[in-house]
């Protein structure tokens, strides 16, 4: 029985028994219910450690499409859970907290994009995966930061393209592909917080460190980077590099996996422009906790549901992306 209080909160706030081994109980429930836990690199390290799969948006979408599990629990944000439901309509898709939104996805309401699209007939619409299902349904193809360049370059040079919603990623893609895509004016609140000044300060005290940046960062930050790439690409670069120190300009949750893969190396998160924090965290990602994950598996709620027509329309651009990424 799902309590009205839980529905109002968007998550189950039932206390877990004192002394419970949460990780063991989560694994027991997964085995009992044929469930898999998918966790994004930006979630808390404890959540990543208990997950069946940890990855970036592209990897998690590919896993969701292929897994034989009956239940998918998405420890990430809402658009990721929607993507799982789009690709796996017959599976029960759960998310530990319905409040886990995304500032970038919210910067592009579907009705506003539909109007913008109508004002620019003849343009193809390329949307970042950080969008709602309703926005995806309006697009020709979806991209992640891993495959965005390859997808954009798959279009003819003279193709007219609208890129939504991240203006920073779009600007980066325009620069590296020599395009002039029309850019939606959206941004990620985490990556928008990185500043040139903070990176210059860190470089002065760590002169041999390599600067790794996500393409959602502003152009001035990207200009200081030794490497620009998706979370998966940043991880790979750090593993292969001879450098021993890295200044990391993306959400700090990724440092957990970086340290696991490269225990002998030092990873320094770039702090936000303001505030006392030494790292830049996504508050939405941090809504995923072990307690909520346990309760979500126990009660099989909150669920993610989509209208079937919307799901079918949103699936087409995702499938095109996955086909290009094989």
Where are these predicted regions, by residue range?
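Active-site loop-to-helix "anion-binding N-cap" substructures in soluble metabolic enzymes
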Residues: 1-229, 233-248, 255, 260-270, ...
